[in-house]
A protein has these predicted regions:
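HotDog/MaoC-like acyl-thioester-processing domains
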Residues: 1-4, 56, 61-62, 73-119
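Hot-dog-fold acyl-thioester-processing enzymes
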Residues: 1-50, 104-119
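Short alpha-helix capping/helix-loop boundary micro-motifs
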Residues: 51-55
Length: 119
């Protein structure tokens, strides 16, 4: 897996315990995974359909640098499934891994449409 995006954890990214807020991390993951999928399909009209079980393995605090990576799992007729991992850049410790994030190509009416990639 290639780690392409990095984020510096700032105070506004934290929860009440002083660690990275999970909702913020999921927002970043969805954005990173969407960009990765758009680059695979060369198609911008996609939506997030599903994410598999989400387990937070460790956390991050102010000043930590995290990095996010995605890799292709499979192509469907209208969908693409990828996995994503977020880890601490310095320690390489996994913070979260999502094994399956499913994106679907949609037409102008929001209906699934073939993305045209056959693999």
């Amino acid at each position: 897996m290639k780690f392409r995006t990095r984020k510096l954890i700032k105070p506004e990214d934290l929860n009440a315990r002083g660690t990275l807020f999970g909702g913020q991390m999921l927002k970043w993951i969805d954005e990173e995974a969407s960009i990765f999928t758009i680059c695979q399909l060369k198609e911008r009209s996609i939506v997030t359909k599903a994410m598999s079980e989400i387990n937070f393995v460790s956390s991050a605090k102010t000043g930590d640098i995290i990095e996010m990576g995605c890799e292709l799992v499979q192509f469907g007729r209208t969908s693409v499934t990828i996995s994503c991992e977020v880890r601490n850049k310095d320690t390489k410790q996994t913070i979260i891994r999502i094994d399956k994030i499913v994106f679907v190509a949609v037409d102008e009416n929001g209906k699934p449409t073939p993305h045209g990639i056959i693999k």
